[in-house]
C-alpha cells in the first residue's frame, strides 16, 4: 500500500475497509450455502429449550459491540420474565436477528445518525421480537413482497448496497420452520419495524 496508505490514519482506514469487505463476503457465502440447503430441505436445525432473556441479552451484547464500531446507536429493552423459555435453534434465531439488522443498516439515511432498537416482549403464548430502524422506510406497495427471494425495493436497487437479496427470505423460512412468523410495518422517510414471534415453551402436566 506504499503511496496509497501513506499515513497511519489512511492505513487504519484501509485495513478497516478490507476487514469489513471480508466479513461481508463471509456472510454472503454463508447465506448462499444456507439458501442451497433451503431448496433441498436439508437445513440442520438443532432445537433446544433456551432462555429468552439469556439468549437476547447475549444478542444485544454482540450487537452493541458490532454496531458501536459502525457508529450506530443501539437500544435494547427486554420485557420478558427471566424464567420464560422457547424451543428453538439458537444459532438460526441469531441468524434471523443478524439478517434483519444487516438489512436495516443497508437502507438507513446517510445524513442522520443511524439507530437500531431491539425490543423483546411477552404477548400471551408467544414472545414477540421487534427490531426498529430509522431508515428510509419501505413503500406500501413493496411491503408485502420484502420476504420474497431476490426481491428488492425501489430504494434498494443501487448495487452499492451489496447483499444477496435472500437475507429476508431466509428469515421467513427459519421462522416458518420454528412454527412462528415474521412481518413488518414501515413508514417512508421514518423507518421500519420488523417483527417475529416464537411460541413459549410450556410444560405439559403428566397425569399420574
Task: Locate the predicted segments by residue.
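Short alpha-helical segment of the dimerization/phosphotransfer core of two-component systems
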Residues: 20-25
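Conserved micro-motifs of the catalytic ATP-binding
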Residues: 40-45, 83-88
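A conserved beta-strand-to-alpha-helix junction within the catalytic ATP-binding
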Residues: 46-64, 120
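Short helix-loop "hinge" at the ATP-lid/N-box region of the Bergerat-fold HATPase_c
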Residues: 104-105
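Short beta-strand/loop element within the Bergerat-fold HATPase_c
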Residues: 115-125
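Short conserved segment of the HATPase_c
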Residues: 138-150
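Conserved glycine-rich
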Residues: 179-180
Amino acid at each position: 500500500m506504499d503511496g496509497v496508505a501513506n499515513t497511519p490514519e489512511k492505513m487504519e482506514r484501509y485495513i478497516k475497509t478490507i476487514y469489513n469487505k471480508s466479513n461481508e463476503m463471509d456472510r454472503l457465502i454463508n447465506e448462499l450455502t444456507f439458501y442451497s440447503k433451503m431448496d433441498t430441505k436439508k437445513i440442520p436445525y438443532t432445537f433446544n429449550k433456551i432462555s429468552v432473556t439469556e439468549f437476547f441479552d447475549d444478542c444485544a451484547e454482540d450487537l452493541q459491540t458490532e454496531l458501536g464500531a459502525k457508529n450506530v446507536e443501539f437500544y435494547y429493552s427486554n420485557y420478558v420474565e427471566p424464567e420464560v423459555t422457547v424451543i428453538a435453534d439458537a444459532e438460526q434465531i441469531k441468524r434471523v436477528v443478524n439478517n434483519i439488522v444487516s438489512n436495516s443498516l443497508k437502507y438507513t439515511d446517510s445524513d442522520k445518525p443511524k439507530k437500531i432498537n431491539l425490543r423483546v416482549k411477552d404477548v400471551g403464548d408467544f414472545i414477540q421480537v421487534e427490531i426498529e430502524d430509522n431508515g428510509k422506510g419501505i413503500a406500501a406497495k413493496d411491503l408485502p413482497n420484502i420476504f420474497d427471494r431476490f426481491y428488492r425495493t425501489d430504494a434498494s436497487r443501487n448495487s452499492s448496497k451489496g447483499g444477496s437479496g435472500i437475507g429476508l427470505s431466509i428469515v421467513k423460512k427459519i421462522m416458518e420452520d420454528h412454527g412462528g412468523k415474521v412481518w413488518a410495518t414501515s413508514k417512508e422517510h421514518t423507518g421500519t419495524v420488523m417483527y417475529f414471534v416464537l411460541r413459549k415453551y410450556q410444560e405439559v402436566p403428566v397425569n399420574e
